[in-house]
UniProtKB/Swiss-Prot annotation:
Membrane association type: Multi-pass membrane protein
Keyword line: Cell membrane, Ion transport, Membrane, Plasmid, Potassium, Potassium transport, Transmembrane, Transmembrane helix, Transport
Organism: Halobacterium salinarum (strain ATCC 29341 / DSM 671 / R1)
Induction context: Up-regulated in response to K(+) limitation. Induced under desiccating conditions.
Oligomer status and interactors: The system is composed of three essential subunits: KdpA, KdpB and KdpC. The complex also contains KdpF, a small non-essential subunit.
Places the protein is found: Cell membrane
Name used for this protein in its record: Potassium-transporting ATPase potassium-binding subunit
Lineage: Archaea, Methanobacteriati, Methanobacteriota, Stenosarchaea group, Halobacteria
Disruption phenotype: kdpFABCQ and kdpFABC deletion strains are only able to grow in the presence of K(+) concentrations above 60 uM.
Classification via Pfam families: KdpA
Transmembrane regions listed in the UniProt entry: 11-31, 81-101, 148-168, 195-215, 272-292, 298-318, 379-399, 401-421, 439-459, 551-571
UniProt keyword Secreted, yes or no: no
Protein task: Part of the high-affinity ATP-driven potassium transport (or Kdp) system, which catalyzes the hydrolysis of ATP coupled with the electrogenic transport of potassium into the cytoplasm. This subunit binds the extracellular potassium ions and delivers the ions to the membrane domain of KdpB through an intramembrane tunnel. The Kdp system is essential for growth under K(+) limitation, and for survival under desiccation and salt crystal inclusion.
Keyword Transmembrane: yes
């Protein structure tokens, strides 16, 4: 059966996404209503959300008693930050130990060995920071490691991000009150009410479509037509895949990730998984407006990032449904039919359009899971991926994405107020040098972490030897690797041999700094703002829910991203495109 025209696939995807973002956004706003110190109530036709308390509250209370959490103990921003760091250090230690000693742990059905110390450092750092960058093949981990190491981290790290959102909302809903809530309560609510139930629903859909789900076997033996006997690793694919995509994780059980039929078997499963990536991030933006008592402001921010997301996705679709210059053969060479577009590195059950939409969904969030090989994309398609990184992953990750987006929103409000000669403020809180210095720290983290290592890598012989492609594409491979780590994304241009000591250590440090430096600065901003009075809006205040504000926000994001990263992009995908490369 022929695939629908690209414009139809594109339109259907974004229409469904817009509807789901509204419903999930109202639901998420309800989940953290009290924790955000908000008066939000869902619309009447969604009031059934409130009846879910009868199911979730007993589970949460049981977890509080079991873990000794006192949900009523409020924390200042410093206490909140301490809890975040302690919680994540525990996740890192768990992962590091499991990875190093998986050969001595149970459920190691095919006898895989433990990882080297540098690879275990990178893997533990990557999965603790919700990056899930893999310098190993997924098949080299045991079922125990996938289930009780990687799988647990895939739930706890997005829960960490979710727990940051109501704390930051308190910065604007509090009136001279430094308390930001209880981190552990917010983690539990995010797990019980958001991540677990929706991931379970996605996993059921995947199993219905044919995705594998087992913890009892290590591999499947197949007698193939052309390769003889082939051993294929199997495990808890459906369960891991669900939270991998919905929790903006990305690391797969198989090396080919969601391009494999065990993880992503059908076009329907592909649509569900593609939608799962941005739903959590965009619903958080919508929920922000509900928490601060201005739904239209949340819709305005969603609209701004939807415009960027849709535009870059359109560029990717154009690039990948066009021809691959490297496949155009002159003379008597083998002719490659490219009527459907660039099929190199793509699955025939998805095609170039669905692969392009997935590609921008995975780089437009901190997901990083792939259903096609990004290093086989055209120069135009590769540019769209790298520019999505330059915007700090468009909508970014679950929880942390909202906070990173709000740094651009606050910067836009600050610039906009100065442009019209008004005192800078945002949602009734004055913006002063204490907050703005931390906003600039967050915005500068990405370029510092990307460009300095990039400059070192292109002159360091060990890094140069890892490049499998010359020229512009080789430069793009390294740039993509550092973008992926520093934006907490995790995907890769797999032509790069990144499983070396250099890349393990550099990327391992990058993912940690990219995660925890912004969190520290953002909680400090929340602490400063929570202590301030709320200034009533006046006629002279900057409106943050108008098309003009949306346009200004888009302009700030693109200008900041383009000015900082344009030279690097010129040496990579832009140079390749202009030189007639693939």
């Amino acid at each position: 059966m022929a695939s629908p025209p690209p414009i139809v696939e594109y339109a259907v995807f974004f229409t469904i996404l817009a509807v789901l973002v509204f419903v999930a956004g109202e639901y998420l706003a309800w989940v953290y209503r009290e924790q955000a110190n908000s008066d939000h109530r869902p619309p009447g036709y969604l009031s059934w959300f409130e009846r879910l308390d009868e199911i979730f509250t007993p589970i949460e209370n049981g977890l509080y008693r079991l873990s000794g959490i006192n949900p009523r103990r409020e924390m200042t921003w410093k206490g909140y930050l301490k809890a975040v760091l302690v919680f994540n250090v525990c996740i890192w230690v768990l992962l590091f130990v499991v990875l190093m000693f998986q050969d001595a742990l149970p459920m190691n059905f095919v006898g895989v060995g433990g990882e080297s110390w540098d690879l275990a450092f990178h893997t533990a750092s990557s999965f603790t920071s919700n990056t899930n960058q893999q310098h190993y093949s997924g098949e080299t981990l045991s079922v125990f490691t996938h289930t009780f190491g990687i799988g647990i981290a895939m739930f706890l790290t997005p829960a960490t991000g979710l727990a940051l959102m109501p704390a930051f909302a308190r910065a604007f809903t509090n009136k001279e009150d430094p308390r930001l809530g209880n981190f552990y309560e917010n983690v539990v609510r995010g797990l019980v009410r958001f991540l677990l139930p929706i991931s379970l629903l996605i996993a059921i859909i995947l199993m219905a479509e044919g995705s594998v789900q087992t913890i009892l076997g290590g591999q499947l033996t197949a007698n193939t037509f052309t390769m003889g006997i082939q051993n294929i690793r199997i495990g808890p694919h459906a369960g891991i895949e669900a939270i991998k995509m919905f929790g903006t994780n990305g690391g797969g059980i198989n090396a080919a990730n969601a391009a494999t039929a065990f993880e992503n078997p059908t076009p329907l499963s592909n649509l569900v998984l593609t939608l799962a990536m941005p739903i959590g991030t965009f619903s958080a933006i919508y929920a922000w407006g509900a928490w601060v008592g201005n739904r239209s402001h949340g819709v305005a921010i969603v609209a701004a990032f939807f415009v960027i997301y849709m535009a870059l996705t359109g560029v990717a679709v154009v690039g990948e449904t066009g021809t691959n210059a490297g496949m155009v053969v002159t003379g008597n060479g083998l002719h490659v039919d490219q009527t459907v577009g660039n099929m190199e590195g793509k699955e025939t059950r998805f095609g170039p359009t669905a692969s392009a939409i997935w590609g921008l969904s995975t780089t437009g969030t901190t997901n990083g899971g792939v259903n096609s090989m990004h290093n086989s994309w055209t120069a135009l398609g590769a540019f769209s991926l790298l520019f999505a990184f330059a915007t700090n992953n468009i909508s970014n990750g679950v929880g942390t994405g909202l906070l990173n987006i709000l740094m651009f929103v606050i910067l836009t409000a600050f610039i906009g107020a100065l442009m019209i000669g008004r005192r800078p403020q945002y949602l009734g809180k004055k913006l002063e040098w204490q907050e703005m210095r931390y906003v600039f720290v967050v915005i500068l983290v990405l370029p510092i972490l990307v460009l300095i290592p990039q400059a070192a890598a292109v002159v360091y012989q060990g890094a140069i030897d890892s490049m499998n492609n010359p020229g512009f594409r080789g430069f793009s491979e390294v740039l993509y690797e550092f973008f992926s780590a520093s934006a907490n994304n995790g995907s890769g241009f797999e032509g790069l041999g990144d499983g070396t000591l250099f890349f393990n250590l550099v990327n391992g440090v990058q993912v940690l700094l990219a995660r925890y430096v912004p969190i520290t600065a953002q909680l400090a901003i929340a602490g400063y703002l929570a202590n301030k009075k709320v200034s009533p809006e006046s006629k002279g205040s900057l409106d943050t829910d108008t098309p003009a504000f949306v346009g200004l926000l888009i302009g700030v994001i693109i200008i900041v991203s383009a000015l900082v990263f344009l030279p690097a992009l010129v040496f990579g995908p832009i140079g390749e495109l202009l030189s007639g490369g693939i």
